[in-house]
C-alpha cells in the first residue's frame, strides 16, 4: 500500500548466477548432455525430430552427442558450475559427427522421414560461412532454471574466446524466442533453413571484432 515502509522482508534479491567455465573433463559429459536434453525439450525443431516424449528422451541425448559432442572431447564446452546451462561450441575446423548422425536417424526415425531430415542436415551444412569460424550447435538452459540470465552468462563468457581470437561465430536458431538474445550479442540473421515441413532454422553470423557486444 502507499506509504508502507520498505523492509528487508519486502526486497526480492535474486539468487546469484552460477559460475561459467569450460567443462573440466569428459567424465562430466553425461551431466552436460542431460542439461541440453532438458533445455531442448520444448524446442520446435528438436520436437519435430522426436514429437513423442518417450522417444525424445530416449534418442535426443544420442543426437546431442553426435551433433555437438566434439565440443566436449575438444575442450570447448562451457557449462555452469551447477550444470543448469551449457553451451557446446565447436572449434574452427571441427564438425558434427555426420556418420553418427546418419546412423542415429536410420535407427530412431521411420524411413518415410529420412529424406526430410537428411535434406535439413545438408542445408545446415551448406549454410556455414566459408571462412573458419566458431560454431555453436547447441546452447541450452534447464527448463527449471530458464529466464534467470543463465543463457546470457554462457554467451558472454564463451564469446570472449571468439573475440580474443578475432574469429567469427555462427549458429542456427531453432527457436524464435532465442533470436533477441543472439541479436544482443551481435549475431545477425543471414537466411532461413527448412526441409520437409520442419520448423524454420535461422542461421546467424557474428562477424569479427564485436568486443563491444559482450559487455551488454
Which stretches of residues belong to each language-model region?
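Active-site rim helix/loop that mediates acceptor-substrate recognition in acyltransferases
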Residues: 53-76
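Conserved acyl-donor/pantetheine-binding loop and adjacent beta-alpha core of acyl/acetyltransferases
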Residues: 86-142, 146, 195-197
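A short beta-loop-alpha structural element at the N-terminal edge
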Residues: 19-38, 42
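Conserved active-site alpha-helix within GNAT-family acetyltransferase domains
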Residues: 152, 164-166, 175-192, 196
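C-terminal "cap" of GNAT-fold acetyltransferases
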Residues: 167-176, 195-216
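Conserved GNAT acetyl-CoA-binding A-motif
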Residues: 132-135, 161-174
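Conserved acetyl-CoA-binding loop-helix of GNAT-fold acetyltransferases
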Residues: 141, 147-160, 184
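Conserved beta-hairpin
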Residues: 69-89, 142
Amino acid at each position: 500500500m502507499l506509504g508502507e515502509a520498505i523492509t528487508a522482508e519486502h526486497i526480492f534479491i535474486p539468487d546469484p548466477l552460477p559460475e561459467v567455465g569450460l567443462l573440466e573433463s569428459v567424465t562430466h559429459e553425461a551431466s552436460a548432455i542431460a542439461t541440453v536434453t532438458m533445455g531442448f525439450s520444448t524446442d520446435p525443431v528438436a520436437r519435430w525430430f522426436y514429437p513423442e516424449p518417450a522417444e525424445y528422451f530416449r534418442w535426443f541425448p544420442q543426437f546431442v552427442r553426435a551433433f555437438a559432442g566434439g565440443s566436449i572431447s575438444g575442450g570447448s564446452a562451457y557449462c555452469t558450475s551447477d550444470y543448469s546451462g551449457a553451451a557446446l561450441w565447436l572449434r574452427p575446423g571441427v564438425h558434427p559427427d555426420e556418420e553418427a548422425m546418419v546412423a542415429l536417424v536410420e535407427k530412431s526415425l521411420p524411413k518415410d522421414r529420412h529424406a526430410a531430415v537428411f535434406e535439413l542436415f545438408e542445408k545446415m551444412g551448406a549454410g556455414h560461412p566459408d571462412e573458419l569460424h566458431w560454431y555453436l550447435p547447441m546452447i541450452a538452459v534447464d527448463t527449471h532454471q530458464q529466464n534467470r540470465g543463465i543463457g546470457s552468462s554462457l554467451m558472454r563468457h564463451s564469446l570472449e574466446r571468439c573475440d580474443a581470437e578475432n574469429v567469427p561465430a555462427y549458429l542456427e536458431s531453432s527457436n524464435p524466442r532465442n533470436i533477441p538474445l543472439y541479436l544482443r550479442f551481435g549475431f545477425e540473421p543471414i537466411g532461413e533453413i527448412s526441409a520437409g515441413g520442419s520448423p524454420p532454422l535461422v542461421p546467424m553470423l557474428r562477424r569479427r571484432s564485436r568486443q563491444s557486444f559482450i559487455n551488454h
